[in-house]
Amino acid sequence: MEDLEEDVKFIADETLDFGGLSPSDSREEEDVAVLVTPEKPLRRGLSHRSDPNAVAPTPQGLRLSLGPLSPEKLEEILHEANRLAAQLEQCALKERENTGEGSGPRRVKPSPRRETFVLKDSPVRDLLPTVSSLARSTPSPSSLTPRLRSSDRKGSIRALRATSGKKPSSVKRESPTCNLFPASKSPASSPLARSAPPVRGKAGPSGRATASPPTPVRPVLAPQPPAGSSQRPSRPQGAAAKPSSRLPVPSAVPRPGNRMPLASRSVPSSKGAPPSDSLSARKGLPRPSAAGHRVPVSQRPNLPISGAGRSNLQPPRKVAVPGSTR
């Protein structure tokens, strides 16, 4: 290496001699050009014709031959190139070492942005407010209260429905003509009538609290196979015919007396219908009826509450309906 360093000369230390292309030669060339062409001075800024094919006159005493470099010159250039390459490599190695030392600790230390998102391993986790699973798992009292309220509402709604199912029956019983309208709703009202027989027994003395057996009365007008519907028809006809025919009869007091023995007669025939229902139905119906054979016809729609009563009452129904309606 020492021999190479001694042999190699840098461009800054060297005195370059390019022969005829030296600056001294160029100056002489300019002087010669000026001397040769004093008659045509060059005017800058003005366009003048130039012949690219014209060959400049060769000045005398100048060597313009540029031949290949001698082997000695090539060796010098090679040595200089090698030395430059070695120095550049050393500089590059030093820079890498410096960068490696500086970047080493940086690589070990992760970026703070990643720490903020990974809460399991970060030391900042203790400083964060604890909101997590406890608050979510234990429901707040405010969330429990609306549930209780909703259940209370459901219970109150059911109670209202039960009471409302009983109230319309008393309203309907006030006038015999009202029975014709609910007859169309007989399938919907019949379950209410079936579910509320004990309430009728309790409210029997009132006379108008009985649930909706009068509603099923109408379907008899059209021939229908089900027993419940066939029992109901005789009533609206009789109810509509009786008040129209016997309204002028003023005997309001003896009518309940006539109905009471009829009630005692009809109780054994029902075989399962509570006597209080028949009594309440008779008292609640405001139609005047003096004949005995028509009273059991009006009582029969109250009996379909029990299945046994329906089956037993079907044949007498067919016999009694034509006589009562006509």
From Swiss-Prot:
The record's InterPro entries line, in alphabetical order, gives: DDA3/GTSE-1, GTSE1_N
- Annotated region Disordered: the residues are 39-67, 92-326
Q: Which UniProt keywords apply?
A: Cell cycle, Cell division, Coiled coil, Cytoplasm, Cytoskeleton, Mitosis, Phosphoprotein, Repeat
Residues carrying Phosphothreonine: T145
- PTM sites of type Phosphoserine: S22, S47, S65, S70, S122, S140, S186, S190
Name any GO cellular component annotation. spindle pole
**Keyword Phosphoprotein on this protein?**
yes
* Stored Pfam families: GTSE1_N
Q: Which GO terms describe its molecular function?
A: microtubule binding
- Ranges annotated as biased composition (Low complexity): 132-148, 182-198
Bias (Basic and acidic residues) occurs at 112-124
Localization of this protein:
Cytoplasm; Cytoplasm, Cytoskeleton, Spindle; Cytoplasm, Cytoskeleton, Spindle pole
- Post-translational modification remark: Phosphorylated during mitosis.
GO terms in the biological process aspect are: cell division; mitotic metaphase chromosome alignment; regulation of mitotic spindle organization
Describe the task this protein carries out: Required for normal progression through mitosis. Required for normal congress of chromosomes at the metaphase plate, and for normal rate of chromosomal segregation during anaphase. Plays a role in the regulation of mitotic spindle dynamics. Increases the rate of turnover of microtubules on metaphase spindles, and contributes to the generation of normal tension across sister kinetochores. Recruits KIF2A and ANKRD53 to the mitotic spindle and spindle poles. May participate in p53/TP53-regulated growth suppression.
Q: What family is reported?
A: Belongs to the PSRC1 family.
Share what the entry says about its subunit structure, partners included. Interacts with APC2. Interacts with KIF2A. Interacts with ANKRD53; recruits ANKRD53 to the spindle during mitosis.
Q: What is this protein called?
A: Proline/serine-rich coiled-coil protein 1
**What is this organism's lineage?**
Eukaryota, Metazoa, Chordata, Craniata, Vertebrata
